[in-house]
């Protein structure tokens, strides 16, 4: 029962496969690759036509259990790819490099004299605290990328890397302007008046809340990894099943929740620096959108940031 997989890209050739041999998805991709100068299988997007729509083939057993000779299949070259693990590593490495450079420059007296904002006092202690909080946050993320996270997709188009890195290299990198006194809209007297009202006028308390949020975030990532491993062990490698226990019953995506809280406490520590506020706002909006997609997907109405409220 041979069928022809038609090419939707100029650089790819049509490929014929025999469904009677019950090939796996990997077998089909390898045959397509061999028929097209051994192009990487991660560049190949394999779809079938369903009600005039192109539906991706992702199940390893699709050609064994669902495919038949009445279906139309297509392939498309996605272009050069990069692994998702490397994407995340590049994203998180950016702020480490940018902040390390600007923090180092902020410790050189001649550079400070030349470039520090005239409207803000030079505060090397605050700079050091902010820098090490940033370093700890992204150091944790790099560790998780290398040793904790699993990715549902192996690769993405390499040209998307620059778009993905913008958020971290640029928006997070802008916070480092604060080492030179830029972006502080409030004077200390006014700011600490409100901090005192909120019982948050102790720096060690704010740092402790930041660290606690980071630890909760790390815990959530470990739980998600263990849950993913459990699902794979029981044959569910593709369909995401929500974790329904503990803090995951309160929040739709508690890893996002504590990520946001970490940046809230950092923003308090860094005296509501406008660049930190911008990064917090953009990050929160994006994670809120992702969280609501999870609520919709799982048919839940769990909180995003505050239990039973929001």
Swiss-Prot record:
Pathway per the UniProt entry: Lipid metabolism; fatty acid biosynthesis
Subcellular location(s) per record: Endoplasmic reticulum membrane
Family: Belongs to the steroid 5-alpha reductase family.
Protein EC: 1.3.1.93
Transmembrane spans: 86-106, 142-162, 166-186, 202-222, 243-265, 269-291
Reaction equations catalysed: a very-long-chain 2,3-saturated fatty acyl-CoA + NADP(+) = a very-long-chain (2E)-enoyl-CoA + NADPH + H(+); octadecanoyl-CoA + NADP(+) = (2E)-octadecenoyl-CoA + NADPH + H(+); (2E)-eicosenoyl-CoA + NADPH + H(+) = eicosanoyl-CoA + NADP(+); (2E)-docosenoyl-CoA + NADPH + H(+) = docosanoyl-CoA + NADP(+)
Protein name: Very-long-chain enoyl-CoA reductase
GO molecular function annotation: oxidoreductase activity; very-long-chain enoyl-CoA reductase activity
Coiled coil: none
Function: Catalyzes the last of the four reactions of the long-chain fatty acids elongation cycle. This endoplasmic reticulum-bound enzymatic process, allows the addition of 2 carbons to the chain of long- and very long-chain fatty acids/VLCFAs per cycle. This enzyme reduces the trans-2,3-enoyl-CoA fatty acid intermediate to an acyl-CoA that can be further elongated by entering a new cycle of elongation. Thereby, it participates in the production of VLCFAs of different chain lengths that are involved in multiple biological processes as precursors of membrane lipids and lipid mediators.
Any further remark recorded for this protein: Present with 23600 molecules/cell in log phase SD medium.
Topology term for the membrane: Multi-pass membrane protein
Record's GO cellular component terms: endoplasmic reticulum; endoplasmic reticulum membrane; mitochondrion
Keywords: Endoplasmic reticulum, Fatty acid biosynthesis, Fatty acid metabolism, Lipid biosynthesis, Lipid metabolism, Membrane, NADP, Oxidoreductase, Transmembrane, Transmembrane helix
Positions on the Cytoplasmic side per record topology: 1-85, 163-165, 223-242, 292-310
Record GO biological process: very long-chain fatty acid biosynthetic process; very long-chain fatty acid metabolic process
UniProt xrefs under PANTHER family: 3-OXO-5-ALPHA-STEROID 4-DEHYDROGENASE, VERY-LONG-CHAIN ENOYL-COA REDUCTASE
Assembly and binders: Interacts with the fatty acid elongation system components ELO2 and ELO3. Interacts with NVJ1.
UniProt topological domain (Lumenal) ranges: 107-141, 187-201, 266-268
């Amino acid at each position: 029962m041979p069928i022809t997989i038609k090419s939707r890209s100029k650089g790819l050739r049509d490929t014929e496969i025999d469904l009677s041999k019950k090939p796996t998805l990997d077998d089909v991709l390898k045959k397509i690759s061999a028929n097209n100068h051994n192009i990487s299988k991660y560049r190949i997007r394999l779809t079938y036509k369903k009600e005039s729509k192109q539906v991706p083939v992702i199940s390893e057993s699709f050609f064994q259990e669902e495919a038949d000779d009445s279906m139309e299949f297509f392939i498309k070259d996605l272009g050069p790819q990069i692994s998702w693990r490397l994407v995340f590593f590049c994203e998180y490495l950016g702020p480490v490099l940018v902040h390390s450079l600007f923090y180092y420059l902020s410790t050189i007296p001649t550079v400070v004299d030349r470039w520090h904002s005239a409207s803000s006092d030079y505060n090397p202690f605050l700079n050091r605290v902010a820098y090490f909080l940033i370093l700890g946050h992204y150091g944790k993320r790099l560790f998780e990328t290398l040793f904790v996270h699993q990715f549902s997709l192996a690769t993405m188009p390499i040209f998307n890397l620059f778009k993905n890195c913008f958020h971290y290299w640029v928006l997070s990198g802008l916070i480092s302007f604060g080492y030179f006194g830029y972006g502080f809209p409030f004077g200390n007297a006014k700011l600490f008046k409100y901090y005192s009202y909120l019982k948050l006028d102790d720096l060690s308390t704010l740092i402790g809340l930041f660290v606690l949020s980071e630890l909760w975030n790390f815990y959530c990532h470990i739980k998600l990894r263990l849950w993913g491993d459990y699902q794979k062990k029981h044959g569910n490698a593709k369909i995401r099943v929500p974790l329904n226990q503990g803090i995951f019953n309160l929040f739709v995506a508690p890893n996002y929740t504590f990520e946001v809280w970490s940046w809230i406490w950092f923003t308090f520590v860094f005296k509501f620096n406008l660049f930190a506020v911008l990064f917090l706002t953009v990050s929160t909006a994006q994670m809120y959108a992702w969280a609501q997609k999870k609520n919709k997907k799982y048919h839940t109405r769990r909180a995003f940031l505050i239990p039973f409220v929001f």
